[in-house]
């Protein structure tokens, strides 16, 4: 179902941790590396060592810092939290401290609502400090 209006929902406190493997196209300028034998992490350009087979692997920034990669969002129904998906593309502050944002109300846009009740391509548009999470009803999706 196509969504034409924004939704007010909240962060549930659930999140997914960042993946390890860096899949970018520019490892020669990348700053986050891990020694594959010892697990030691480096925040400096180690491309030369990587290129010459020194056992280093580029890792994602989120993995380096132990951040969340996406946070779960939800709505309320009959006093219970109903998860409606995960949001990525969040600020470093939010990803670094996901539990600090539990129950914070946000305005979200999305391409559509899937058949199983999840948002597809959700995007955070901003915080709604004027609302309590209990006001974020599943009824918005009908």
Which residue stretches match the model-derived regions?
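Nucleic-acid 5′ end/cap handling module spanning
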Residues: 1-111, 122-128
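C-terminal accessory nucleic-acid interaction domains of nucleic acid-metabolism proteins
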Residues: 111-142
């Amino acid at each position: 179902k196509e969504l034409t209006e924004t939704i007010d929902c909240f962060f549930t406190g659930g999140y997914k941790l960042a993946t390890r493997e860096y899949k970018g196209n520019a490892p020669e300028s990348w700053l986050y590396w891990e020694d594959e034998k010892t697990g030691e992490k480096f925040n400096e350009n180690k491309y030369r060592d990587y290129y010459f087979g020194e056992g280093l692997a580029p890792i994602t920034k989120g993995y380096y810092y132990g951040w969340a990669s996406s946070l779960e969002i939800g709505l309320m129904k009959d006093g219970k939290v109903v998860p409606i998906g995960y949001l990525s593309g969040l600020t470093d502050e939010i990803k670094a401290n996901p539990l600090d944002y539990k129950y914070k109300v946000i305005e979200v846009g999305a391409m559509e609502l899937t058949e199983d009740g999840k948002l597809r391509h959700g995007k955070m548009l901003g915080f709604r400090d004027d609302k309590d999470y209990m006001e974020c009803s599943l009824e918005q999706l009908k």
